[in-house]
């Protein structure tokens, strides 16, 4: 859903959209939730979650090149869970209101991490492939506060977990990567009429570069 021109500029030229950092409170909640799950079965949190032990938190991945393209995957997933059958569940943890729309929004991201885990980049000077991890399930673990109580001098927020299964569709993922490859191999796409950053960049450039007009040098602050 990202603007195609903004994506092109980011990947091809390293020009990122300006962004605000995540508020510290969300990072703190996210880190504590993830960290306290490592080494534990998800059933410790809720019996409604899949049966499996969280083995890794915030793991970096990098893939081999996706076949038929010049694209590779690089990024960081949230949680990796080992299932009873020795395969793995890949989990994206969100502090957000749960909703089925999240499945569509994050399925490509989870599919990308799945590909990277199953097709790891070759280590420098090592064998053809790194350690392959088989991923048989994808899911979203979503927390959203719904109650608060005051006790013993503390405000205690309740964060009940919600679980959403994300279907695996390797064929759809490869088709999507093919489109990405085609986009990056061509000329820059046009500005998006609905992208606020494109509008800001375009109008800002016009207003800031006014040819021989006056420029304010003696700034008041």
How would you describe each model-predicted region?
Residues 20-23, 100-101, 133, 205-207:
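Catalytic phosphate/metal-binding cores of nucleic-acid and nucleotide-processing enzymes, i.e., regions
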Residues 40-45, 117, 121, 180, ...:
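Hydrophobic, Leu/Ile/Phe/Ala-enriched alpha-helical segments that form helix-helix packing faces
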Residues 44-49, 150-154, 209-211:
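Short aromatic-enriched loop/helix-cap "lid" or pocket-rim segments at secondary-structure transitions
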Residues 49, 53, 124-130, 190:
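Short acidic alpha-helical/loop segments enriched in Asp/Glu that coordinate divalent cations
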Residues 31-35, 111, 193:
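Non-catalytic, well-ordered alpha-helical scaffold segments
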Residues 1-87, 97, 219-221:
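Metal-dependent nuclease catalytic cores that hydrolyze phosphodiester bonds in DNA/RNA
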Residues 2-13, 85, 132, 167-221:
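Accessory terminal regions of nucleic-acid processing enzymes
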Residues 63-175:
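Mg2+/Mn2+-dependent nuclease catalytic core
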């Amino acid at each position: 859903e990202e603007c195609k021109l903004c994506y092109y500029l980011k990947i091809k030229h390293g020009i990122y959209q300006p962004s605000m950092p995540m508020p510290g409170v969300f990072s703190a909640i996210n880190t504590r939730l993830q960290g306290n799950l490592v080494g534990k079965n998800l059933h410790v949190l809720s019996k409604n979650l899949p049966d499996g032990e969280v083995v890794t938190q915030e793991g970096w991945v990098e893939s081999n090149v996706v076949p038929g393209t010049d694209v590779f995957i690089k990024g960081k997933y949230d949680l990796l869970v080992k299932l009873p059958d020795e395969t793995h569940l890949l989990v994206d943890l969100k502090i957000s209101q749960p909703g089925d729309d999240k499945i569509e929004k994050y399925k490509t991201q989870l599919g990308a991490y799945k590909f990277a885990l199953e097709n790891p980049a070759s280590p420098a000077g090592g064998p053809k492939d790194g350690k392959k991890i088989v991923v048989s399930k994808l899911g979203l673990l979503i927390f959203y506060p719904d109650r608060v109580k005051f006790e013993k001098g503390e405000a205690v927020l309740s964060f009940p977990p919600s679980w959403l299964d994300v279907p695996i569709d390797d064929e759809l993922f490869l088709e999507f990567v093919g489109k990405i490859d085609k986009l990056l191999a061509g000329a820059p796409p046009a500005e998006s009429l609905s992208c606020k950053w494109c509008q800001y960049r375009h109008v800002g450039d016009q207003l800031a570069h006014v040819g021989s007009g006056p420029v304010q040098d003696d700034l008041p602050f």
